[in-house]
């Protein structure tokens, strides 16, 4: 394994290196590691991964590792099934092509091996080994060779097909590839005759189709509701049907027919006529092979009707041939049994009937056909008149004419025509035996109506195309299945018909030509015949009575007709109108259903596209994020790897790295590695210093002295050795010089001896040249000719090669141009997608900016409203101050209590105190109270400004504005109400308080709301509010100038003291305010009704009159309680004040 995770291109390069050195398993492991690594799955495009995938699959095919190829294909599908489907398709097709090529090569190799074995020894072909092997296993040499060489590759190819089908079965982008691979698998089964694999393949495809039908209502994946999917599935099943018929697997063919019928029934569009014709043709073939001649004829009849109605270029010869085929198939149907065996013995079993009904559904028939119904349909379509002259009388001979003596001869002529006819009539040959059996049965029935007994020899003469055994078998079968009364006498060699008078043939008349009834039939119908004869006799004896009855009946019928003709006519017209309305209604319903279905499908498609687009965007973002992370990680790893390589070049670096494992190195970065390197260097330097110091200590004085004594001896030895070496060299050099002089002398003497041979050498060379001159010239001439031929050949080859090179260069240019255009198209599509994404981003930003602007606008409006409310509040405060000054001036006068009107009750009557003169509080007290009120008002503003701003916005400001515009008593709440102690209070010793006690003037510590006029403005006893004073004034009955009684005044409660002893309303505000907040209290205060129109309460003026209110209380306000009990403490005792 590699030390670090390799990049795909590096892995491919390393895999090629492994392949070159003959290690494919190592190469496959290297490539497989790339696909298993999740880091690289989505970081590279298909241009990088696709070559690696081809190499990976090539190695899997070479090594027959189908399970490893499956793993890689599934990983590749997950990576590129939504990015580039063409790449996935190319990879799968290339993988299957490689597997097929290797399988074909193995087949050729197996055949070649068998051929070599057969040609090994021509004299002894059957060797003892081959004889023993054939005796043991029963196989020949080809089978054994295929099992050894071919079978492993066939198994690998089959597994490859199954893996690819499983890979693509739910991928909506690869439906075409899925069905192409299914057809390739069918061809594989046909080529190698793999019947068991074909059955498993059919089951697998049927399971896939069932899964698609179950999940058809999902928004993703393959949907069977799509027209394209239905057509692809139908074409694949038709191909499956053809393959099953070729392999003679009739059970699989029948299942394929059921699947085809289900797909055609599921489709909303009518199949094309060509498909239906192919379907009926294959269905007729399957019924023929199954021996079901009835449904075989019915399928051929449906095919004939379809071809005759829809095929425009149908020739007369084709029509005659098809008509003859249908006629012979229909007439060859065996005669039906009067009492079938399942009716006799298995009467409760409905399986045969259900099976027939199921087969009829495959043909599109409402009920199972019968021989009589098919013959009737053949006659209706005028098929007997459309056939050629040879078959035109066949229907009359078998079904109409009664001629038992010549029946078999006539049928034999038709049989001879079929057998000796052209090749076109070969399709009719399978019907000959069935036609003969039907003819024999017709002959036996007709003979039984003419003769009571007949000899075997005579019957065999009439039935010319069967022998005695076949005839006897047919007689027994006719008795068994058709309830014919036949008795065979083998002693007399004759046959008896209808001799038993106790049995009847059937309850209905038999089909086919008849001459007379059988004796048993005559016995059964004797009473019927007697009734017929008697009826005829009565009509002869009384001819007029029957005529009168008929005339009377005719008159009644005419009279009845005239009575009901108008009603019936209207009913018929109404029925026609009802039918038309019903048709229109059904048509509208169908149109509405189709539109709804189209809308639903469009909506589902739109949702699916949106979901798919969103998912693709998310995946794209995820891939970009992972790619960015992988790039950062790769940069880090690259720098780390470079740093490690740099450090490993030094000795201390190797030593430091040897102490770390791979995981430890991966956890470190470059800085940490450099730091450890520096630490290692420092540690080694310290160790070296310590070693040097320890060695220095070990060297002693004796060692140094010994070496000093050795120095002169070494110098003397070297001097003597130098002298000896010089003497040896001089002796050696003298010897070499002497040897060289001797060798020179010997060489000169040898040369002098050889100079005498020069003339002989020259003569020999001249003679040799003269002898071989002609041979040399001949060879030169041949060489020149061969050279010229070779030159011309090479020139021609060079011309052809250059032409081919130019053609290949042109093709490469075209291919490069095509690839360049495809790349440009892809880049343009990518640019469009990026532009669309950018447009969506800009649109989202515009929407955000629009919402931000709306928010700023709304915020500006709220600030403007708050500013206006603040201005109104300041203006109202100024007006209150002015009105307070005016009210203080009006109260500066003394007023006797006896000056009140007579109609107003006295304070003593209401409160139980003595009648006396009371005067208001001194000016100083009023000033104190005014200052307290101002102080309290400020506290109220400080305390409830934020809370009252919403109430002002909702109720107060608008109501004040309306009052000002209407010109009403807008300043009524500004008039300072006189204290209850000055208007209707009792004397200090026995006075009470009406409508709530006033606080003491000495209560300088009290907060806002203690005084009645301040509470009216800031707090109504249920929470601070503004703008609601008019409603509160209505509750109190309005302001009064004099001391008259208030209209809503309650009976005063005795407190046992003066007005100071009365409980203050503001002493316990928390108890007065219930759970639910200030808004509910304000709503309840607003709901309070004012004084009735025109009722001033005695003594009020226009300033104190409340403004009229038009709004009505809401349901929420009406449901809330009108009374509330507030409790507050005063002077050590508990009192209860009930407010309305």
From Swiss-Prot:
The keyword Protein biosynthesis applies. Its main location: cytoplasm. One of its GO terms (molecular function) is mRNA binding. Keywords: Cytoplasm, Initiation factor, Protein biosynthesis, RNA-binding. Residues 1091-1101 have a biased composition (Gly residues). It is found in: Cytoplasm. Residues 319-502 form the PCI domain. Pfam families: eIF3a_PCI_TPR-like, PCI. Residues 590-624, 826-903, 925-965, 1000-1019, 1026-1053, 1061-1087, 1108-1130 have a biased composition (Basic and acidic residues). HAMAP family: eIF3a. Belongs to the eIF-3 subunit A family. Component of the eukaryotic translation initiation factor 3 (eIF-3) complex. The eIF-3 complex interacts with pix. This is Eukaryotic translation initiation factor 3 subunit A. It comes from Drosophila willistoni (Fruit fly). The lineage of its organism: Eukaryota, Metazoa, Ecdysozoa, Arthropoda, Hexapoda.
């Amino acid at each position: 394994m590699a030390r670090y995770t390799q990049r795909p291109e590096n892995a491919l390069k390393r895999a090629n290196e492994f392949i070159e050195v003959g290690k494919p398993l190592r190469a496959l492991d290297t490539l497989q590691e790339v696909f298993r690594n999740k880091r690289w799955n989505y970081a590279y495009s298909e241009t990088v991964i696709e070559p690696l995938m081809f190499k990976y699959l090539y190695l899997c095919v070479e090594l027959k590792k189908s399970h490893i190829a499956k793993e890689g294909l599934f990983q590749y599908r997950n990576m590129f099934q939504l990015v580039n489907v063409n790449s996935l398709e190319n990879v799968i097709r290339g993988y299957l092509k490689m597997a097929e090529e290797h399988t074909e090569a193995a087949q050729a190799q197996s055949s070649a091996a068998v051929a070599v074995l057969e040609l090994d020894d021509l004299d002894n072909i059957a060797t003892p080994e081959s004889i023993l092997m054939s005796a043991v296993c029963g196989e020949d040499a080809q089978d054994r060779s295929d099992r050894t060489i071919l079978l492993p590759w066939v198994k690998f190819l089959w597994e490859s097909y199954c893996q690819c089908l499983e890979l693509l079965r739910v991928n909506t982008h690869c439906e075409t590839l899925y069905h192409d691979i299914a057809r390739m698998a069918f061809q594989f089964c046909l080529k190698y005759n793999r019947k068991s694999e074909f059955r498993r393949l059919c089951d697998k495809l049927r399971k896939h189709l069932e899964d698609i039908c179950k999940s058809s209502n999902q928004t993703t994946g393959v949907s069977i509701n799509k027209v394209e999917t239905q057509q692809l599935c139908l074409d694949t099943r038709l191909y499956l049907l053809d393959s099953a018929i070729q392999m003679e697997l009739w059970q699989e063919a029948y299942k394929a027919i059921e699947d085809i019928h289900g797909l055609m029934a599921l489709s909303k569009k009518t199949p094309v006529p060509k498909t239906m014709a192919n379907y009926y043709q294959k269905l007729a073939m399957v019924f023929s092979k199954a021996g079901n001649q009835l449904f075989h004829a019915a399928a051929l009849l449906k095919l004939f009707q379809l071809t005759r109605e829809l095929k425009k270029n149908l020739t007369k010869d084709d029509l005659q041939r098809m008509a003859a085929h249908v006629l012979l198939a229909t007439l060859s149907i065996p005669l039906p049994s009067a009492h079938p065996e399942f009716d006799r013995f298995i009467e409760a079993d409905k399986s045969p009937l259900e099976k027939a009904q199921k087969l009829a559904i495959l043909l599109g028939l409402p009920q199972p056909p019968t021989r009589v119904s098919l013959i009737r349909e053949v006659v209706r379509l005028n098929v007997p008149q459309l056939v050629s002259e040879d078959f035109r009388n066949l229907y009359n001979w078998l079904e109409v004419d009664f001629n038992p003596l010549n029946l078999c001869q006539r049928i034999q002529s038709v049989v001879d025509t079929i057998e000796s006819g052209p090749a076109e009539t070969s399709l009719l040959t399978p019907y000959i035996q069935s036609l003969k059996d039907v003819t024999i049965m017709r002959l036996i029935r007709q003979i039984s109506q003419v003769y009571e007994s007949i000899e075997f020899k005579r019957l065999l003469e009439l039935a010319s195309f069967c022998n005695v055994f076949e005839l006897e078998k047919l007689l027994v079968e006719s008795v068994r299945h058709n309830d014919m009364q036949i008795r065979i006498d083998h002693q007399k060699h004759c046959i008896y018909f209808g001799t038993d008078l106790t049995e009847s043939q059937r309850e209905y008349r038999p089909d086919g030509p008849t001459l007379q009834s059988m004796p048993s039939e005559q016995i059964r119908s004797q009473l019927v015949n007697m009734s017929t004869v008697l009826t005829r006799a009565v009509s002869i004896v009384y001819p007029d009575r029957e005529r009168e009855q008929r005339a009377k009946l005719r008159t009644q019928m005419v009279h009845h007709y005239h009575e009901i003709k108008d009603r019936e006519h209207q009913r018929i017209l109404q029925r026609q109108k009802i039918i038309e309305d019903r048709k229109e209604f059904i048509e509208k319903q169908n149109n509405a259903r189709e539109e709804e279905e189209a809308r639903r499908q469009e909506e589902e498609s739109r949702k699916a596209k949106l979901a798919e687009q969103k998912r693709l965007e998310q995946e794209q973002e995820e891939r970009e994020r992972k790619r960015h992370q992988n790039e950062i990680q790769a940069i880090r790893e690259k720098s780390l790897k470079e740093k490690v390589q740099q450090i490993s070049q030094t000795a201390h670096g190797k030593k430091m790295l040897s102490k770390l494992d791979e995981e430890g190195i991966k956890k470190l970065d470059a800085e940490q590695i450099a730091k450890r390197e520096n630490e290692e260097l420092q540690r080694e330097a310290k160790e070296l210093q310590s070693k040097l110091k320890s060695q220095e200590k070990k060297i002693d004085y004796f060692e140094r002295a010994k070496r000093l004594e050795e120095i002169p001896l070494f110098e003397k030895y070297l001097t003597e050795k130098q002298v000896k070496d010089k003497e040896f060299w001089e002796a050696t050099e003298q010897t070499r010089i002497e040897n060289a002089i001797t060798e020179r002398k010997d060489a000169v003497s040898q040369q002098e001896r050889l100079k005498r041979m020069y003339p002989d050498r020259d003569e020999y060379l001249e003679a040799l040249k003269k002898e071989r001159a002609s041979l040399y010239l001949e060879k030169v001439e041949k060489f020149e000719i061969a050279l010229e031929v070779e030159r011309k050949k090479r020139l021609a080859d060079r011309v052809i090669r250059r032409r081919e090179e130019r053609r290949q260069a042109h093709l490469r240019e075209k291919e490069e141009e095509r690839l360049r255009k495809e790349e440009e198209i892809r880049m343009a599509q990518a640019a469009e997608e990026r532009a669309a994404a950018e447009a969506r981003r800009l649109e989202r930003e515009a929407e955000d900016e629009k919402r931000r602007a709306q928010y700023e606008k709304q915020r500006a409006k709220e600030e403007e409203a708050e500013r206006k409310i603040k201005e109104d509040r300041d203006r109202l405060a100024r007006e209150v101050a002015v009105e307070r000054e005016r009210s203080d001036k009006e109260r500066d006068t003394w007023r006797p209590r006896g000056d009140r009107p007579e109609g107003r009750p006295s304070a003593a009557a209401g409160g139980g105190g003595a009648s006396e003169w009371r005067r208001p509080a001194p000016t100083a007290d009023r000033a104190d109270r005014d200052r307290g009120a101002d102080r309290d008002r400020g506290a109220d503003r400080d305390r409830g400004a934020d809370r009252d701003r919403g109430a002002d916005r909702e109720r107060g400001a608008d109501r004040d504005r309306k009052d000002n515009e209407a010109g009403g008593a807008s300043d009524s709440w500004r008039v300072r109400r006189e204290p209850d102690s000055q208007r209707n209070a009792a004397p200090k010793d026995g006075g009470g308080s009406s409508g709530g006690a006033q606080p003491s003037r000495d209560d300088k510590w009290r907060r806002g709301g203690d005084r009645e006029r301040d509470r009216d403005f800031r707090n109504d006893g249920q929470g601070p509010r503004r703008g609601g004073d008019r409603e509160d004034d209505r509750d109190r009955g309005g302001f009064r100038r004099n001391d008259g009684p208030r209209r809503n005044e309650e009976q005063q409660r005795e407190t046992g003291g003066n007005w100071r002893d009365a409980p203050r309303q503001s002493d316990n505000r928390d108890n007065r305010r219930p759970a639910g907040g200030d808004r509910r209290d304000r709503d309840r205060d607003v709901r309070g009704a004012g004084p009735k129109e025109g009722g001033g309460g005695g003594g009020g003026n226009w300033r104190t009159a409340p403004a009229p209110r038009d709004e009505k209380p809401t349901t929420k306000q009406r449901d809330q309680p009108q009374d509330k009990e507030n409790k507050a403490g005063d002077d050590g005792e508990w009192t209860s004040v009930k407010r309305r």
